[in-house]
Amino acid sequence: MKRRLALAVDGGNSKTDLALIGEDGEVLALVRGPRSSPQYLGADGCLDVIGALLEDALGDARLPRTNEPVAEIASFLLAGVDFPSEEEDVEAALRVRGWAERTHVGNDTFAVLRAGTERGWGVAVVCGSGINCLGVAPDGRQVRFPSLGAITGDWGGGYDVGLAAVFAAARSEDGRGPKTSLEQVVPRHFALETPFELAEAIHRGALQQTRAIELAPVVFAEAERDQVAAEIVDRLAAEVVALARVALARLDLTDEPVEVLLGGGLIEAGDGRLVGAVRAALTEIGPALTVQRTASPPIAGAALLALDRLGVTHEAKERARAELTSIAPEAGD
């Protein structure tokens, strides 16, 4: 008798995790690869990345590759899938691949929410290279945000935090802004001496501006002793609070005992200042709210959503969660 399998994918802007899970919750394979966001790669490019990972997973699980679907159900939770039309594009491309009998495509915020709660509802805010939020009410109503950056009113995530550090360092050097230790540590991260040298390197193409994302951990470290860095972290906390507050209000859940889950690489890299500030602000807005980091990785959330649709036992889901939490690589976006 053929074993019933679930295929789970958590695809971010910097990495992709793929897992194969049996109906008993056993994790047969877990592999990691490069980013797969269709926002950057398109639907087919996204699935090319996932397809290569699937081949690796089949090898690890010692499963044959045939023309038959690999899994009965597959859950693809991807950064950059922000509109129904984008979900449809990926769904259409998946039908051609034929990896699963049934597929579910959604934004990666759903993975964080499901990883953090058994309820199936609540609010999740994800801070990775960017920032996003999802709210789900007990009756299934949803609040989502396009999360396209500045054009949809967003600030937050690793890139924005890093660029804010570059901005502050430059203004510290030329006198337009307050003095900050970022003036020294930001260029030093790139083996340069001054913010001016850093600006020249970016301007002349010797250094890609996108590498500003590397500075987020630097900002968190400096925030312990530098006021300007601390203000950047506080600004990020305020953005997380704003997203969660709006989601709660639009779902009429502000006064309810809602779980607010925080996930993503930037949350994992941050210290207690960020989560503490978010928790303090949100519990003032809604005293019954609980705010916590997700204890399980997003790939566990993607797997649990697939297993939900497969109709397996609670024990099987708990096994999958435990195994994925114990063996998943370090969190990222």
Name these PLM-found stretches.
Residues M1-R65, V70-A71, R95-V96, A115-W121, ...:
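ATP-binding/phosphotransfer module of carbohydrate and carboxylate kinases, centering on a glycine-rich
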Residues C46, L77-V81, C127, A221:
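N-terminal loops that bind phosphate or other acidic moieties
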